[in-house]
């Protein structure tokens, strides 16, 4: 048996495996892909942290709070041992004149096929992370990912140089004009795509208030179904909870709309392992603070009664 959250995710995986198109991609890994899909999660029935594999709530929450703070430097994430964005910062570093170590070209693929190189890569990454944590000057230069999510959410800059806080504006709109159809935040800024380590995959989200409940719909242009989507589901569910609390509302639905939803060819075995599992009851979320959403910390959040199958490792495509 599957709970409704795991069932929705499993249905996406099964459909892409069954009818998806075989495609090449930017990372040269290869994918099975479907264009256009939608999942719906009733947040009143629990918190959608998948149970057919362990998903780290700490990683989900600290990344989301990093976005909310408007931060774009991995130093904050590394303080919480969150390594989600390391590869993109590391890639910028090894291309710089500052880097003097062994050749790390195409480290993502080489580390998977060459054990000796993988040991070199792990050592260079370890040194890189340590310098980010201990050397603020180095972190400022090589830990920053450019104008990624947090910058666009909190400090969008228009053609005239005016700064606009999308997230704060949307929260005020929800409080004072809940029926508006303009409760939208966009991370896709076409004029700044080239300044980002990775263009935004989860591109735009919109809020909807009905009967005292806040719902959120995300449009995700590009979705790594195995590694990314479980995090994205939990992240935007958490965002919905935080903004609902900020606005004095209950939670409604999280609606997840996909553009290119894909399974990487080297994730197929891992997905099939997950699909063979049954699920546990979903956990619940507790927010143990009355702080503003802009001041809340990871320590203020708690996942209650989370039981899951073990995590399943798979390589990330950079």
From Swiss-Prot:
<feature type="binding site" description="in other chain">
    <location>
        <begin position="221"/>
        <end position="224"/>
    </location>
    <ligand>
        <name>dUMP</name>
    </ligand>
</feature>
<feature type="binding site" description="in other chain">
    <location>
        <begin position="262"/>
        <end position="264"/>
    </location>
    <ligand>
        <name>dUMP</name>
    </ligand>
</feature>
<dbReference type="GO" id="GO:0006235">
    <property type="term" value="P:dTTP biosynthetic process"/>
</dbReference>
<comment type="pathway">
    <text>Pyrimidine metabolism; dTTP biosynthesis.</text>
</comment>
<feature type="binding site" description="in other chain">
    <location>
        <position position="232"/>
    </location>
    <ligand>
        <name>dUMP</name>
    </ligand>
</feature>
<dbReference type="InterPro" id="IPR020940">
    <property type="entry name" value="Thymidylate_synthase_AS"/>
</dbReference>
<dbReference type="InterPro" id="IPR023451">
    <property type="entry name" value="Thymidate_synth/dCMP_Mease_dom"/>
</dbReference>
<feature type="binding site">
    <location>
        <begin position="181"/>
        <end position="182"/>
    </location>
    <ligand>
        <name>dUMP</name>
    </ligand>
</feature>
<feature type="binding site">
    <location>
        <position position="317"/>
    </location>
    <ligand>
        <name>(6R)-5,10-methylene-5,6,7,8-tetrahydrofolate</name>
    </ligand>
</feature>
<dbReference type="GO" id="GO:0005829">
    <property type="term" value="C:cytosol"/>
</dbReference>
<protein>
    <recommendedName>
        <fullName>Thymidylate synthase</fullName>
        <ecNumber>2.1.1.45</ecNumber>
    </recommendedName>
</protein>
<dbReference type="GO" id="GO:0032259">
    <property type="term" value="P:methylation"/>
</dbReference>
<keyword id="KW-0489">Methyltransferase</keyword>
<dbReference type="InterPro" id="IPR045097">
    <property type="entry name" value="Thymidate_synth/dCMP_Mease"/>
</dbReference>
<dbReference type="GO" id="GO:0004799">
    <property type="term" value="F:thymidylate synthase activity"/>
</dbReference>
<dbReference type="InterPro" id="IPR036926">
    <property type="entry name" value="Thymidate_synth/dCMP_Mease_sf"/>
</dbReference>
<keyword id="KW-0963">Cytoplasm</keyword>
<dbReference type="GO" id="GO:0006231">
    <property type="term" value="P:dTMP biosynthetic process"/>
</dbReference>
<comment type="function">
    <text>Catalyzes the reductive methylation of 2'-deoxyuridine-5'-monophosphate (dUMP) to 2'-deoxythymidine-5'-monophosphate (dTMP) while utilizing 5,10-methylenetetrahydrofolate (mTHF) as the methyl donor and reductant in the reaction, yielding dihydrofolate (DHF) as a by-product. This enzymatic reaction provides an intracellular de novo source of dTMP, an essential precursor for DNA biosynthesis.</text>
</comment>
<feature type="active site" description="Nucleophile">
    <location>
        <position position="201"/>
    </location>
</feature>
<keyword id="KW-0808">Transferase</keyword>
<comment type="subunit">
    <text>Homodimer.</text>
</comment>
<feature type="binding site" description="in other chain">
    <location>
        <position position="26"/>
    </location>
    <ligand>
        <name>dUMP</name>
    </ligand>
</feature>
<feature type="binding site">
    <location>
        <position position="224"/>
    </location>
    <ligand>
        <name>(6R)-5,10-methylene-5,6,7,8-tetrahydrofolate</name>
    </ligand>
</feature>
<comment type="similarity">
    <text>Belongs to the thymidylate synthase family. Bacterial-type ThyA subfamily.</text>
</comment>
<dbReference type="Pfam" id="PF00303">
    <property type="entry name" value="Thymidylat_synt"/>
</dbReference>
<keyword id="KW-0545">Nucleotide biosynthesis</keyword>
<dbReference type="InterPro" id="IPR000398">
    <property type="entry name" value="Thymidylate_synthase"/>
</dbReference>
